[in-house]
Amino acid sequence: HIKPFIETAPYLIVIFKKPYDIVDGKRIPNYYVNESVGIASGFLIAALQNAGLATLTHTPSPMNFLHEILERPENERAFLLLPVGFAKPQTKVPNISRKAPFEVMTQYF
């Protein structure tokens, strides 16, 4: 499938996860890898948007080619691809506002 945003974005951020470390030739598992990398990716996306940049998440399948062409160690796996740049002038970015606290919470006294 052709994804023009991959070719036109001025920056591509590839986020890798590290499911295990290698210490003295032994695999040592890292716990909650997907959760940790997912949360960190969310912080990065929020910061990019706060800086006025546009991005979207892309998870090509398979992603092994990223591991190979970027020459990453065997214990790293591509997690997410973020094309980053300024939105084109004709792009319609949704004007999303937060709900007021009383709309989403219940207080108990």
Protein language model regions, located:
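C-terminal helix-cap and adjacent tail motif
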Residues: 77-109
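Short hydrophobic alpha-helices that are characteristic scaffold elements of the AMP-binding
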Residues: 46-50
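GST superfamily/GST-like fold recognition
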Residues: 28, 32, 53-65
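Glycine/small-residue-rich phosphate/adenosyl-binding loop
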Residues: 1-37
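Short, electropositive alpha-helical surface patch
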Residues: 66-80
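Short secondary-structure boundary segments
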Residues: 17, 60, 86
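Solvent-exposed alpha-helices and their adjacent loops that cap or buttress functional pockets
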Residues: 4-7, 71-74, 97
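Short, solvent-exposed loop/turn segments at secondary-structure junctions
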Residues: 21-24, 63-67
